[in-house]
């Protein structure tokens, strides 16, 4: 193996690990899947109401056990519906759109909604690849900073025959490690 390539790989891996560890705990989500932990950096400056909702629901244990009900390879994985059908949500009121100029790239976390732009509630999705057709039409509230390989391992389907579930989802500040 080329020593320069090896060293570059080590530096990149360390950089990602340090970035994930150095993230502000109050604005970091730990989403544990059966395959491992996904670390999501929250973006409260971009979508304050959506970030507040995600944190509120995570702190209440709302997402624990909820399945990824819509997973399209090469596009996105969607979860956050307690019924597992894509039609449900929390008992909280829907949120107004907080669209931004942030692009949907691999690992972007956005809020799912109906055709009504002000209908986001608890469902969210993580993009597998750049999705420019979503830009400006869906609220971006986070980005995966570590563990995207675990999102890649989520079972595909609409719905998947054996769906992957969120084991636990917590605000990092609330997790003792």
Where are these regions (language model features)?
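Cyclophilin-like peptidyl-prolyl cis-trans isomerases
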Residues: 3, 7, 11, 15-177
């Amino acid at each position: 193996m080329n020593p320069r390539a090896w060293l570059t790989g080590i530096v990149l891996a360390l950089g990602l690990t340090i970035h994930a560890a150095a993230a502000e705990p109050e604005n970091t989500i730990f989403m544990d899947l059966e395959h491992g932990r996904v670390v999501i950096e929250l973006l409260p400056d971009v979508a304050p109401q959506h970030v507040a909702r995600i944190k509120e629901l995570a702190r209440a244990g709302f997402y624990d056990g909820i399945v990824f009900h819509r997973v399209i390879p090469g596009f996105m994985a969607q979860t956050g519906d307690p019924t597992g059908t894509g039609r449900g949500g929390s008992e909280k009121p829907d949120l107004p759109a907080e669209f931004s100029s942030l692009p949907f790239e691999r690992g972007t976390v956005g809020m799912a909604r109906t055709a009504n732009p002000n209908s986001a509630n608890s469902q969210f999705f993580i993009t597998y690849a750049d999705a420019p057709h979503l830009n400006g039409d869906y609220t971006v509230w986070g980005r995966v900073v570590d563990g995207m390989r675990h999102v890649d391992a989520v079972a595909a389907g609409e719905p998947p025959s054996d769906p992957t579930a969120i084991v636990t989802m917590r605000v990092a500040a609330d997790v003792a490690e």
